[in-house]
Structure formats: C-alpha cells, structure tokens
Amino acid sequence: MKVENHNLAVASLKTQRISAFKARLVAVLLKGKKVSDALAILAHTKKKASPIFTKLINSAVANAINNHGFEHSNLIIKAAIVNEGPTLKRFRPRAKGAASQILKRTSHFKVILASQNGGESQNQEYQEAEKNLVSKSPENTQSGALSQQIRGEQPQNDPENGVDSQLSAKTNSTTTAKKTDLADNNTKNDATNTVLAQEKEVK
C-alpha cells in the first residue's frame, strides 16, 4: 500500500552539462530554506549551477501553486538532489601522435518543495497506515495465536485475520493425550516394581 504525500511539489531537469560534484556544492546551500531565501542565496552565488537551480525552483513553485494550491509564503525546499547523468567521452590530441581522454559529465537535477501547513497530519496518516499493514500481516496473526496458547488462553474468533478456535482445540486435545500416555506409563512402571518386589521376597 502506497500513501501519496500531497504536500510535496516536484520539478526535475535532466542532462545538464555540469558535473554532479560541482552542482552539489550549491545544492547543500538550499535544503531546509524558504523559497525566497533560497532564491536570494542563488542570486549571490557565482556558480554554474546557480541559474539551473533558480530555473528549477521557479518551475517547482509554479507546480505547487497551480497543481496543489499552495501559498508561496509557506513553501520550503525539502530536498535538492543532484544525480550523475551520462558522460560524453571525447579525446584531445597530444604530442607525438598521442591522445588524452576528455570526460564531459552531465547531471540530473531535482527539487522537492513542501508546504509547512499540513505536513504533520500527512505523516500521522502514513504512520497509521503502516501500523495497520503490520498488524494485519499473517505472521503477526500466527505469532499472536501462539502467544495466547503459551499463556493458556484461547484465541478469539477473528474472521478478518483468520484466527479460529479450532487451533486451540487441537492443541488442547494433543496435550490431554500426552498426559494420559504419561499416566499409563506410570501405572505400568508401578506394576512392574511390585512384581519384582514380590519375586525378591519369595527367593
């Protein structure tokens, strides 16, 4: 079961001609900032990735306002992700007919915006859904029935989880059968002991 978070707005940009290492130097400055503060930081950061992130944040803000109805003042940057893209391999001629390799790296950018209002309620819904999935799993159902048997309790009938009282009846019947077998063995041992004692007295 997948719980969708409607408090997030995402914008992505792929195959940009910049290395992921250089772009991440700018990405670390944006996480957790408000949109207005992030744009101000990018305006005063003289890096190649700054205009790329500015374009991407503006796109994410437009998605948040048009698709989700968020307010611009409540938006914060939850994540600024930079992944490596395909690398273009070229060569440069060198002396004596040799050649050296040139790696033209690319990167994929992604910006995730979150709304400050309603984030806690969404996290609570996700946690409740996760708890329901864990409680209704068959492994937890079987473990609960076994724990009740160990304590000597009879599990209640639960049609949703498939727990039935037949399981407890079977276990009770097996335990009673074992007890009767032990009692029979004890009586047999007592009879043999009395016979041996009588034989010793006769001798």
From Swiss-Prot:
<keyword id="KW-0699">rRNA-binding</keyword>
<feature type="compositionally biased region" description="Polar residues">
    <location>
        <begin position="116"/>
        <end position="126"/>
    </location>
</feature>
<dbReference type="Pfam" id="PF00237">
    <property type="entry name" value="Ribosomal_L22"/>
</dbReference>
<feature type="compositionally biased region" description="Low complexity">
    <location>
        <begin position="168"/>
        <end position="194"/>
    </location>
</feature>
<feature type="compositionally biased region" description="Polar residues">
    <location>
        <begin position="134"/>
        <end position="167"/>
    </location>
</feature>
<dbReference type="GO" id="GO:0006412">
    <property type="term" value="P:translation"/>
</dbReference>
<dbReference type="InterPro" id="IPR001063">
    <property type="entry name" value="Ribosomal_uL22"/>
</dbReference>
<comment type="function">
    <text>The globular domain of the protein is located near the polypeptide exit tunnel on the outside of the subunit, while an extended beta-hairpin is found that lines the wall of the exit tunnel in the center of the 70S ribosome.</text>
</comment>
<dbReference type="GO" id="GO:0022625">
    <property type="term" value="C:cytosolic large ribosomal subunit"/>
</dbReference>
<comment type="similarity">
    <text>Belongs to the universal ribosomal protein uL22 family.</text>
</comment>
<dbReference type="InterPro" id="IPR036394">
    <property type="entry name" value="Ribosomal_uL22_sf"/>
</dbReference>
<dbReference type="GO" id="GO:0019843">
    <property type="term" value="F:rRNA binding"/>
</dbReference>
<dbReference type="GO" id="GO:0003735">
    <property type="term" value="F:structural constituent of ribosome"/>
</dbReference>
<dbReference type="InterPro" id="IPR005727">
    <property type="entry name" value="Ribosomal_uL22_bac/chlpt-type"/>
</dbReference>
<dbReference type="InterPro" id="IPR047867">
    <property type="entry name" value="Ribosomal_uL22_bac/org-type"/>
</dbReference>
<keyword id="KW-0687">Ribonucleoprotein</keyword>
<feature type="region of interest" description="Disordered">
    <location>
        <begin position="116"/>
        <end position="203"/>
    </location>
</feature>
<protein>
    <recommendedName>
        <fullName>Large ribosomal subunit protein uL22</fullName>
    </recommendedName>
</protein>
<comment type="function">
    <text>This protein binds specifically to 23S rRNA; its binding is stimulated by other ribosomal proteins, e.g. L4, L17, and L20. It is important during the early stages of 50S assembly. It makes multiple contacts with different domains of the 23S rRNA in the assembled 50S subunit and ribosome.</text>
</comment>
<keyword id="KW-0689">Ribosomal protein</keyword>
<keyword id="KW-0694">RNA-binding</keyword>
<comment type="subunit">
    <text>Part of the 50S ribosomal subunit.</text>
</comment>
